[in-house]
């Protein structure tokens, strides 16, 4: 980010938003809002550092979410006030008579997903999973029991310690073994909504899988 810079929430001023509305737009679609994996170090602000081996590029993929309840610090002028800056942007957009759309990524998350900003009482994705089972309808992820994550790439990525994950989790593009290839979404983990892909896609929806409730709560958080 020090080399290339990044647009900020605050850059979309009232006058900019008004000009968008005057061109006939009814909504603005802000992409990359939810916090995702990056190689930029924000540990001074209490944000965990992501292992570089599982971040694509330096800025990371905006679809490798690390916290569904947070916004991306790259987009804030004051990192510690990042959510307030986003909320102020939404308010400016509404005042300019524009609806607001953001990306919701329901299929997968980053490999080091940990929510710092989740509301009280909310359990993290994967926190209660039975990792000894490749598939369990109440798990949030899919696992490769007994196998560590062994992608095609160097898991050190210039660091002293390699990235380690055991059991390995399935990728967001449905690679269900522990050795994703160059064309796989190796930096992501697929979410389990109760479909057993190991058995040909059989669905288990009664009782309702836990992931559905967690994702419902995330949607309600943003809709509010």
Q: Predicted regions span which residues?
A:
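Acidic, His- and aromatic-enriched active-site or binding-groove loops in soluble protein domains
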Residues: 54, 117-176
